[in-house]
């Protein structure tokens, strides 16, 4: 008999988590078959306090900073929360950073990570992370990977941006 291995295991785990989230009633498939959060909140207009949860040493963070500076987006205060964005310890690190951000009196949180392989981005498909995102009081934008990348974090967030820099434009 044949067994899925490698990327096949990841795909099976992804589908299983999608099914659990649908069964729990917190996410459902849209007309295109993409899983989306039930009850997604609208993004605040002209947010004054924006949290950015990402690795402060990442290219994604550098790109976000450059986008903020070049866009003249100086009406908002940006508060950064450093976290791991890859590896087995990343989900717990992201959950901790999101907890800090959610209690910081922000108008919106951006969860950001640049592109990478399916394995590199896998931490954003963690069930505990998904449940943390669903529990946030603060609206959240998931800006993980590139346009072709899709994660559970995208599904359970209030808004998905196709890239970290696009999240600034989406504000």
How does the language model describe each region?
Residues 47-171:
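Short glycine/threonine-rich loop/turn motifs
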Residues 1-81:
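Short, glycine/charged-enriched hinge/interface segments at domain edges or termini
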């Amino acid at each position: 008999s044949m067994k899925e291995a490698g990327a096949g295991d990841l795909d099976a785990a992804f589908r299983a988590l999608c099914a659990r989230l649908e069964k729990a009633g917190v996410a459902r498939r849209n007309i295109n078959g993409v899983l989306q959060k039930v009850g997604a909140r609208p993004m605040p207009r002209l947010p004054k306090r924006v949290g950015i949860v990402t690795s402060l040493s990442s290219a994604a963070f550098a790109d976000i900073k450059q986008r903020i500076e070049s866009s003249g987006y100086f009406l908002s205060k940006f508060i950064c929360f450093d976290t791991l964005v890859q590896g087995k310890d990343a989900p717990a690190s992201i959950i901790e950073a999101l907890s800090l951000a959610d209690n910081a009196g922000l108008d919106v949180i951006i969860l950001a990570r640049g592109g990478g392989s399916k394995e590199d981005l896998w931490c954003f498909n963690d069930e505990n992370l998904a449940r943390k995102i669903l529990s946030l009081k603060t609206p959240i934008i998931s800006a993980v990977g590139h346009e072709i990348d899709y994660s559970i974090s995208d599904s359970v967030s209030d808004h998905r941006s196709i890239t970290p820099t696009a999240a600034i434009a989406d504000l």
